[in-house]
Regions:
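Non-transmembrane, aqueous-exposed alpha-helical and coiled segments at domain scale
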Residues: 104-111, 116-168
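N-terminal, charge-rich interaction modules
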Residues: 1-104
């Protein structure tokens, strides 16, 4: 199934049952966990990473402009080429999302969360995708691509939740 606008949720939409009623409870729970992780980790400085600014500098402006979306997807039954097509669909949605030009065009991010992907399989899963994806085309379009396969630890976070997300952001 291709990426669809109806699969995109702003962080504040996750608390609105009328906006998320089509999602399985497990998907809602996973998206809420990633939203919490974004608000409490990704947008803040982290001394262990050696930078004074946020973990990802593209996320705070996207949050401020309400152009950061989460999408719940399933990995089951999908091959690496299927995932490449899916992510390409989200790439097109991101590039087409307003605004498409001007200074604010770079303040957009999409986090694709593979809600059924066990953390133990995430690295191999994303390695297979990386071997097939056209990273050059992402760079040419001014996009950053970050499959979160690194350990993310904090007071309430483990790799169990966050090794299965995939982040696209617009940057220049």
């Amino acid at each position: 199934m291709p990426a669809q606008v109806t699969n995109l949720f702003l962080l504040e939409n996750l608390e609105d049952a009328s906006r998320t009623r089509e999602l399985a409870e497990s998907d809602r729970k996973a998206l809420r966990a990633v939203a919490d992780w974004i608000k409490t980790f990704v947008v803040r400085p982290h001394r262990d990473l050696g930078c004074a600014g946020p973990v990802c500098p593209f996320v705070p402006p996207a949050l401020e402009h309400k152009t950061l979306w989460l999408a719940a997807e399933r990995s089951a039954g999908r091959s690496a080429p299927d995932i490449v097509k899916l992510i390409d669909g989200y790439k097109r949605l991101l590039l087409a999302a307003q605004p498409v030009d001007g200074d604010d065009a770079s303040n957009k991010s999409v986090f694709v969360v593979f809600t059924d992907l066990p953390a133990a399989q995430a690295k191999d899963f994303f390695d297979g995708v990386l071997q097939q994806i056209g990273v050059r085309s992402y760079v040419d379009d001014g996009l950053g691509w970050d499959p979160s396969t690194r350990a993310t630890k904090g007071p309430r976070y483990t790799t169990q939740t966050f090794d299965r997300s995939h982040h696209l952001c617009r940057r220049y």
